[in-house]
Amino acid sequence: MSFDRPEIYSAPVLQGESPNDDDNTEIIKSFKNFILEFRLDSQFIYRDQLRNNILVKNYSLTVNMEHLIGYNEDIYKKLSDEPSDIIPLFETAITQVAKRISILSRAQSANNNDKDPENTSMDTDSLLLNSLPTFQLILNSNANQIPLRDLDSEHVSKIVRLSGIIISTSVLSSRATYLSIMCRNCRHTTSITINNFNSITGNTVSLPRSCLSTIESESSMANESNIGDESTKKNCGPDPYIIIHESSKFIDQQFLKLQEIPELVPVGEMPRNLTMTCDRYLTNKVIPGTRVTIVGIYSIYNSKNGAGSGRSGGGNGGSGVAIRTPYIKILGIQSDVETSSIWNSVTMFTEEEEEEFLQLSRNPKLYEILTNSIAPSIFGNEDIKKAIVCLLMGGSKKILPDGMRLRGDINVLLLGDPGTAKSQLLKFVEKVSPIAVYTSGKGSSAAGLTASVQRDPMTREFYLEGGAMVLADGGVVCIDEFDKMRDEDRVAIHEAMEQQTISIAKAGITTVLNSRTSVLAAANPIYGRYDDLKSPGDNIDFQTTILSRFDMIFIVKDDHNEERDISIANHVINIHTGNANAMQNQQEENGSEISIEKMKRYITYCRLKCAPRLSPQAAEKLSSNFVTIRKQLLINELESTERSSIPITIRQLEAIIRITESLAKLELSPIAQERHVDEAIRLFQASTMDAASQDPIGGLNQASGTSLSEIRRFEQELKRRLPIGWSTSYQTLRREFVDTHRFSQLALDKALYALEKHETIQLRHQGQNIYRSGV
């Protein structure tokens, strides 16, 4: 019988050369000396750490492996090469030192209180021997990280350091370390100590098949007489022992699944994952979506579902003996974003880098430099690039006194014609953001974006597996083809975009995952291209609920402009002939652009070091401008006699605040000034307000000279020309009004569109026939 998962086991079939007791004693002595004697700058860090942990009843010790190299390279080499044998000895040494420290501390305390030190010492010794458990060794290391896909047979049973994303965590399970068993017939009790360090779930425990008291009595009787008396023997039957749970000892154990970081997965490859196990004080340290750095032992175990198992026919024989499944026995885990691999390269700032970033922040043209550095291969779209700079910087997160959180991340939607470089901008953001996940709307489901509940094939237990919004926690999610998503899948990210959490209540699992990400989405209008003769509501196939969660909405049009077309054509030709690279290198040398790596480091530095707040003058200016924006939207809605499909609510005021804070953050300014507010309002006017006010009737078209008054005059002429119940053809109206130069072609189309919306006319036969149906 076993308290561990029965599917996985290990058995020492071939005993190798094991160190004798003298060697073990020497190793334990070396570790004890290291704990007691190692110091940095006259401070005994491990002795003090152990004393503090004992006071708070934290029975663990965190050791930096680099300190072992400087103290004793031999024990460091033994620990690295034979961790499964050496770590239990290290933990024994820690426990012995802890007992010694506790005894000395209590004796000193007793002397200070004038008590009998001998009696106190004896009582304390016996108490500590029974109360202090075995301490856990937790390792930290600065060794080079090994990519997940580079782990091979050479690393088996060695300590490795690797990084990745936690995609699933199991519930805590209990693992027995000491079993107290009792015979159900004669009440004989005994105990079993379980050494389960080497296995993923501990060695399978087999209880004695017969009563040990019966065996002992038979042995003693055989010594007294050669002839045994059958009547005096006990017969407790087979398998008589039961486990006494109250007297047994257990430790916590948890299973994790680690996946490669998306940025490090080679093109065309699937991200790989690896099972991990941790126990005691390393459990419940991370949640799905956390980026971690792991120090652990790369080991293998025999899986029941592997080759040669009973399901494939043949019991446990065949190839199942040779083929093992790898796993990591965790010895140390760092779960902060700043210590994960992708941030590790950008958060270790040297003094020279910090000085360089401070000088860069004082550059009055920094805003333009960062804008020019965003996708330099794409011509134009300056406002969109500025919005992306704000998205990468982000605003300031706030926690209110009542515990409510206000997001600081900025969401941007690019909506427009094909061929306007929307996808290229998304790809560039994925490259320049320290943490980014790129996905396409058609290939993304609600579970793939948020989180899904999976069933472990071995244990049949349910566990959570994080989606794109969870894996990109602390970064950016780029969603291309946003309009191709199903409505029910798009609704799933509402909570993630505003509250920045994902609530799960599936299969008995109820939890909340963090999703502190910015969303950069790209979409096409309903008809493929944006139709100027239709309102934004007819062009945009999104609900108001999702649109209100975007801080900036850009409508990107492919307008026909000869001068602009010439500039774009020359830019594209330079890219294909290689001249653009030379120009970009020259601009980087001149300081008008910065490299991707430098920009990534500067963005990370700004996000870590700066959290601006609004000045009183900036806050007052924001408030008055928001009232003006709302009033302007109301006037537009009254003129068009319909509500805008792009809402301007209090969320948009918070959006302008976040944009203002991001503009101050890129300058490392702790206070957002009025000039930041002016630029934030200009960006908001150029994006969301421009999209909301794009009415086919009320707007002005400077290229054709069409105005609202011309459209109104045409409506009056058409009502006089066409009585109720009459019809005419589109070509007839064009000959009468356009060919005679009385009205423009655009005025004709807009007027017909407006009259149809007001149900004054009906367009039949694909718009070729106009029927007057109302007033």
Curated annotation (Swiss-Prot):
Chief location of this protein within or outside the cell: nucleus
Short sequence motif named Arginine finger, residue ranges: 548-551
CDD domains: MCM5
Enzyme class: hydrolase
Gene Ontology cellular component list: chromosome, telomeric region; CMG complex; cytoplasm; DNA replication preinitiation complex; MCM complex; nuclear pre-replicative complex; nuclear replication fork; nucleoplasm
Keyword Chaperone: no
Sites where the protein binds ATP: 416-423
Protein family per UniProt: Belongs to the MCM family.
Protein function: Acts as a component of the MCM2-7 complex (MCM complex) which is the putative replicative helicase essential for 'once per cell cycle' DNA replication initiation and elongation in eukaryotic cells. The active ATPase sites in the MCM2-7 ring are formed through the interaction surfaces of two neighboring subunits such that a critical structure of a conserved arginine finger motif is provided in trans relative to the ATP-binding site of the Walker A box of the adjacent subunit.
Entry protein name: Minichromosome maintenance protein 5
Provenance organism: Saccharomyces cerevisiae (strain ATCC 204508 / S288c) (Baker's yeast)
